[in-house]
Amino acid sequence: MASSPVSRVVYNGKRSGGPRSPGAGSEIFTPAHEENVRFIYEAWQCVERDLRSQMGSERGLVEEYVEKMPNPSLKAFKPVDLSDLKRRNTQDAKKS
């Protein structure tokens, strides 16, 4: 069975201001964690905005990156559904 190439979305642009992360409720996050989450959120918002704005155009700011030589150690990698993981952790915390 041939392994399919790994693809990633690559954003080539500047960061901009955007909405901040909602209150954490009972969870406590470090300022570094909040900064990382904010950076990822803002970067992804820029990617989505650029994808919407380039619809129909031949080439835009957002390109799909395809790995030419995928790492063999990642062959069995299964992505994690972070929403599901958070939901399960929240349910486990309520049981305790």
Swiss-Prot record:
Where does this polypeptide localize? Nucleus; Cytoplasm, Stress granule
Alphabetized InterPro entries for the sequence = MCRIP
* Keywords on record: Cytoplasm, Nucleus
Instruction: Give the CC-aspect GO terms.
Output: cytoplasm; cytoplasmic stress granule; nucleus
Gene Ontology biological process terms from the UniProt entry: regulation of epithelial to mesenchymal transition
Q: Where is this region: Disordered?
A: 1-28, 76-96
One Pfam family linked to the record: FAM195
Compositionally biased region (Basic and acidic residues): 81-96
Motif PXDLS motif covers: 79-83
What is the annotated role of this protein in its UniProt record?
May play a role in the regulation of the epithelial-mesenchymal transition.
Q: What family is it from?
A: Belongs to the MCRIP family.
What protein is this chain from?
A: Mapk-regulated corepressor-interacting protein 1
**Native species:** Gallus gallus (Chicken)
